[in-house]
């Protein structure tokens, strides 16, 4: 999974410590899961789903800078990612967003944080390493470019899907559960809503 992604992506680079990339990836995921677990306790008890999303958030957060941050930077990126994912999921849920798995929070919010974190923790030019904030501009431009591209292509694809086969299921299918309506079985019986 993510080790192939982060470490494998660095194989094309010259003079990169692949083991260090694996370590920063692991540290950020661990810090993200621990922070998400403790942050999710604001609801009274630790939430396993949030803890797992915290690990993913740590992985997403470290991806942009996995080869350019040290271990402390990786832990700090993971800590922030873990808290961000919990607060973001809760916020979007309260606002009525339909994001059952927290994908916007994990990949969108924590991805933005990870790109900005490079400007802070990059050991060559990051804010904490004498860069004076010079990386913030390029990182922000990258975020805006990626966001514009993702929005435009997603909008186009979703419009095509909606105008052909439809983007939403019926209310009845949603209440019954997509596993039941599409496959005739229930994968997550504990999550069935009874009327």
Which role does the model predict for each range below?
Residues 1-195:
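Glycine- and aromatic-enriched membrane alpha-helices
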